[in-house]
Amino acid sequence: MNRQTSLPEQRQLLIRVSDSNYDENTKLVVTTFYTSSEDANNNNATSSYHNISTHFVNITPDDVCKFFDENPTQSIIFAKGAEPIRHVLIPLFVSNERYVPHQIHQYYDIQHLYYKGGVEDENQMEEEDVDVAAEDDVAIARAIMEMSEETQCVSSSGVSSLLIFESLYFGSQIWVQLSKKIRKESFSPPPPPPLACLHGHPSPYIPVALCQPPSMGVKELPLDGMASIFSNYQPRKKIRAKFILSIFRPNFWSVLNKKANGKIRKKPFLCSSAEAMDFVSANAVIVRMRGLPYDCTDTQIRAFFEPLKLTEKILFITRTDGRPTGNCDAFVQFETEEDAQQGLLKHRQVIGQRYIELFKSTAAEVQQVVKRCNLINSAPVVANAVEVSDEKKKDCVRLRGLPYEATVQHIVNFLGDFANMVKFQGVHMVYNNQGNPSGEAFIQMISEQAAAATASGVHNNFMCVGKKKRYIEVFQSSAEELNLQHLVHQQQQPQAAPQALGFLAHLPPPAPGAQQIWTSYPSPPISPILPGQVTQLIIYGIHLSIGVPELVANFTTPDHTVENSFEVQEVMFTRWPTHLCPGEAILTLRSRAVPTQTAQTSPLSQISQISAYSHHHHPTGLPPNFPLQPILME
């Protein structure tokens, strides 16, 4: 059927990709034809045929730009689907740092001219890898010229779908919204060419209507980061599997499981306070693993330690956003000390392409690492100090940066008018496992509103203790870490034996001036100075690369030893080193002349026993649930 063309004096560009791989070696069949005014009034098909020239070219951005520059308003693109434009033309411009012509943003879809039999015939041809011959482009060009203006409908997958698809694949910050807003962190596209300039939208969330065909969107997104990507453009199922799924790939902080049905599940390694509590509650030997691959699984870890048997619990440590800590990757547990020693012999063996460092660890270190990685609320309250109805209720505040000489009265003066909203016996000083002040305190307020007002009212205010003037950081907190602190403390602190209490009963009473003065805001007693064969050192300026093994090796001499085992902890970091601030640690030196079994572990056990005896005989009496031992803290 010969018909007068509705587009006289227009240069038209027909683009068809010769294969479905869309790689850098892709060749294009470019058919150019020019329709003159005389041809428009001529119904002879032969004359239209002779005005069509077909040739193979390896298209370049300069050629396309020249084509559009010569015909800025009358250039029309006919394409066999949107894929040649999405996967060839636009990446071609971006990779060569050229602007994308605005004419590319609209095109005419002429797939139906290639496949008269419908979608089923196209599927069959794609499965058989049948390509359309170049000679067919001449017939397609003639068919385009014979198309009426009514049938030249712009494809529904025009500007929006083209830019969205390319932006998603090439990694710009544009995301799809179906029924809810989606966090950018839920996805991890591969490193992009700079295609973000196409949409130029500053917002991280962009509402987008799904397009047909092809349509693409997020079907569902639960809180665990699972999403289903679907496309109803069945003729391009191979391209969909290659390109749509490629935008979700394993990166440095997540593991993606790609399934055949298009569902993609992201499983970041996260840790909560409940998991940490459950982990340290087991009576097992803990080993720390450092340097794990970013996509390491528990199966690989168990295979690494074979034939040794691990417990069922493996604790992976990451930050709340899924990024690895860069310092400690996982904790594992062995049932016996012998298995742990055999497992440590695998130090610096490899998993995949990375060598793994192994260190013996403790429950206290697990708690410190979890706290340092902000995986639980950084506001531990004194364990079992008061009855807590809701651990997640943020009715506490945490004070950090206190002078070591600070007392409860200093804290009360620091709070000022906010001290009226402190619960009875609600100020709790925090001590490390050597019984020394850690520079932190936790305060229970009467309500969440009071805690929020206190945190915002006195945050970064200065506290003066003697000649020292330090600013104090104040954060709103909850009691969620309460049980974890108490559990770790119970494992590290030796319980007072009945015979020890009987011995203490014959001790002379302390001097009146040395007795603990209990105020309305009592706090665990400060460690007294007791004679013994232990010497404690405070080490400042610890570099980021220095750990517990290096400190133990550096301070071990023929006359002194530093023991850091599962039973005895004599190296304790009070501040972990970072890139911005050096670390601090407290180290306990022992004389080799004193046997280990008779040596004084620390003044901590004596403090607990004396405090319990004094509390029992105190005339005023205290609530039975008030802790009378220092809190274990980093």
UniProtKB/Swiss-Prot annotation:
GO terms for cellular component: nucleoplasm; ribonucleoprotein complex. Pfam families: RRM_1 (PF00076). It is found in: Nucleus. Residues 285-363, 395-479 form the RRM domain. PANTHER family: HETEROGENEOUS NUCLEAR RIBONUCLEOPROTEIN-RELATED (PTHR13976). mRNA splicing factor that regulates alternative splicing of many genes in embryo. Probably plays a role in the formation of embryo-specific isoforms. This is RNA-binding protein sym-2. It comes from Caenorhabditis briggsae.
